[in-house]
Swiss-Prot record:
The keyword Transmembrane applies. The keyword Transmembrane helix applies. It comes from Shewanella piezotolerans (strain WP3 / JCM 13877). Part of a membrane-bound complex that couples electron transfer with translocation of ions across the membrane. It is a multi-pass membrane protein. This is Ion-translocating oxidoreductase complex subunit A. The gene is rnfA.
């Protein structure tokens, strides 16, 4: 049980996919200008990342490995991710039309988020079992969400701050992301 907790904490804080592995930088920079959109993207990404991680593990174990189709791994994982995103979009549209409108274009954009494919491939490379795959996917999603929401809150405050003209916009966002990455480096010794 403690192994699973260490995997979760390690994935969320120590080996954060955005700040340490540099995966998912496009939505990190693109969706983080408003806190509302960052929260919506975080919720959708958490669901998709967790489900895609589990399904990718199952596809690999019960389809690709038994039939010696390892060379189709990346393509099949992309297909799994696209199916999960479409399923998520249909589910959200059917259950909550207001949430679907709020998420808007962000749902289909999850398909192109490299963090989702990265988690699926790292699950296989690190030889995780089913439960570890689920925890790894969920931990990666929580880490992505944590960083996205924190960064979004900082960018909203920076928009209201008196920032020198050369640093306005993307420049101060990159400096802030770098400082945030340095702060997360403090978690390095937390999990071995």
């Amino acid at each position: 049980m403690s192994e699973y907790l260490l995997l979760l904490v390690g994935t969320v804080l120590v080996n954060n996919f955005v700040l340490v592995k540099f995966l998912g930088l496009c939505p990190f920079m693109g969706v983080s200008s408003k806190l509302e959109s960052a929260i919506g993207m975080s919720m959708a990404t958490t669901f998709v990342l967790t489900l895609a991680s589990i399904l990718s593990y199952l596809v690999n174990q019960y389809l690709l490995l038994p039939f010696d189709l390892g060379y189709l791994r990346t393509m099949s994982f992309i297909l799994v991710i696209a199916v999960v995103v479409q399923f998520t979009e249909m589910l959200v549209q059917k259950t909550s039309a207001s949430l679907h409108r709020a998420l808007g274009i962000y749902l289909p954009l999850i398909t192109t988020n490299c963090a989702v494919l990265g988690v699926a491939l790292l699950n296989i490379n690190e030889d995780h079992n089913f439960f570890e795959s689920a925890i790894f996917g969920f931990g990666a999603a929580v880490g992505f969400s944590l960083v996205l929401i924190l960064f979004s809150a900082m960018r909203e405050r920076l928009a209201a701050a008196d920032v020198p003209a050369p640093f306005k916009g993307g420049a101060i966002a990159m400096v802030t992301a770098g400082l945030m990455s340095l702060a997360f480096m403090g978690f390095t010794g937390l999990v071995k």
